[in-house]
Amino acid sequence: EAEQQYKIFVLKYFDERKQETLIAGDMFEMEWKEQIDTSIPTLFIVSGVFQYFYEDKIIEFIKKLKKEFPYGELIFDTARKKSGLRFANWFIKRTGNPEALMHFYIEDSADFSKKTDTTLVEELTFFKDARELLRKKLNFITKLFMKIADYKRQALIIHLKW
């Protein structure tokens, strides 16, 4: 019942495209994999999720993905260094949402890929494209914070494969 309601909610905001599958469920439990052909190459995009869990849980999840999907790639966003996480949590507290604090960050992407037995394909700064696309729509302070975060590499997009 809850799974069906979630799927209806998701489909209200996201269109399911050809060769895309939107699945409701606990990502750590892996029952959702039954809805996907695990024998073909699969790209997982996990956006705005990992930060809310601890590193050991994320590493365990990636290892499960590797076991269930032999030809996989994973793209996700993360804070880099504890300072990036401190900044994000400071900002979250200011918005009045102290229950949504972030825990996961990566000090070194190459080291993290070794911990997960994956290959680091790419590491990108998080806001570069957004700053260019939205430059006329953002206020000065937002642009400044985004630029500082990119300059200090505090927020990243990581691409791993196995």
Indicate where each model-derived feature is located:
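Alpha-helical subdomain
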Residues: 1-162
